[in-house]
Amino acid sequence: MPPKIAEVIQHDVCAACGACEAVCPIGAVTVKKAAEIRDPNDLSLYEKGAAFQVCEGCLTCSRICPVVDGFIENELLNVRKFFGAKSKDNAGSQDGGVTSGILKALFNKGEIDCAVGITRNENWEPEVVLLTSAEDVERTRGTKYTSDPVVAALREAFEKYDRIAVVGVPCQAHAARLIRENVNEKIVLIIGLLCMESFHHDVMLDKIIPEIMKVNVRDIVKMEFTKGKFWVYTKDGEVHSVPIKDIAKYARNPCHHCCDYTSVFADISVGSVGAPDGWNSVFIRTEIGEKYFDMVRDEMEIMEDPKPGLELVGKLIEMKRKGNAEHFQEVCKEFSFETGIRSETV
């Protein structure tokens, strides 16, 4: 019997988080724009350059796939604390630099020995990397709005390190949580990012920025989604923007089925929505998240009641789910297994 992820791939809703590649015992899965699994009954996958080994049907991947697991109806139900924060060392960071600040402080305190993150080159092409020091964290500052299989890097991390932090968008945070609960407890902290949608890097770098926005990618120093637009800032001080509604159609297909905006499965979620300019919004979701944030609190400035607060976050949650929930429920009808949007707390 093929694993459940084969159906996820078939229906083009694979999030390409990389979890299946990270945990497959024999290396039968590789993740590119979507997962690809070697199935002896489907020779077309051999032609696509999928993994070297043939799937043996252990079904480990079915236990850690965020799409197979489904979504949570109320993603704010598990928020223990919500506040604004800014790292005291946030030069070069996006907004308040909280994510980088947490990782740097935990490395310096010896609480983690590895963090999985994304860096980029001067062409904004992303690369998943294993960070092993506070100095390494400096290379990953700033948000990247293109998708890469971050969680796949855990395969190497599990072999070399014992106290691993994972930073990722909702599907990646979800996958990391499932791996921690079902496969490997070396993941000690999951930091989830707020995400409306993401783009394949070739679409962003070859289509949206040069063709639609008429900007040279190599001139860009910062990108951000805010106030209903996608903004890019260039070396010469120019600012360019395009309405998000004009480029949303170019987002990855699984993003149009995603019903998690705030990384509900993370220990700590970090974003900018709900906090003033220059600050991050911080959601403490688990006892683990509370413990680790308390360790680094002295490295942060805290705003106890940020505005516009959770009211705006809630509006964006509803905005993301408005069409996506229906799309996801429709594809769920095609699966041979049960999944969907469930009313429970994680």
From Swiss-Prot:
Location(s) in or outside the cell: Membrane; Cytoplasm
Residues at which [4Fe-4S] cluster 2 binds: C55, C58, C61, C65
Keyword Cell membrane: no
Keyword annotations from UniProtKB, A to Z: 2Fe-2S, Cytoplasm, Electron transport, FAD, Flavoprotein, Iron, Iron-sulfur, Membrane, Metal-binding, Methanogenesis, Methanol utilization, Oxidoreductase, Repeat, Transport
Temperature dependence: Optimum temperature is 39 degrees Celsius.
Effect of pH on activity: Optimum pH is 8.5.
Entry-linked InterPro entries: 4Fe4S_Fe-S-bd, 4Fe4S_Fe_S_CS, Co_F420_Hydgase/DH_bsu_N, FPO_su_F, FRHB/FDHB/HCAR-like, FrhB_FdhB_C
Subunit field text: The FPO complex is composed of at least 13 different subunits.
Protein function: Component of the F(420)H(2) dehydrogenase (FPO complex) which is part of the energy-conserving F(420)H(2):heterodisulfide oxidoreductase system. The membrane-bound electron transfer system of the complex plays an important role in the metabolism of methylotrophic methanogens when the organisms grow on methanol or methylamines. Catalyzes the oxidation of methanophenazine to dihydromethanophenazine. It shuttles electrons from F(420)H(2), via FAD and iron-sulfur (Fe-S) centers, to methanophenazine (an electron carrier in the membrane).
Name of the featured protein: F(420)H(2) dehydrogenase subunit F
Organism placement in taxonomy: Archaea, Methanobacteriati, Methanobacteriota, Stenosarchaea group, Methanomicrobia
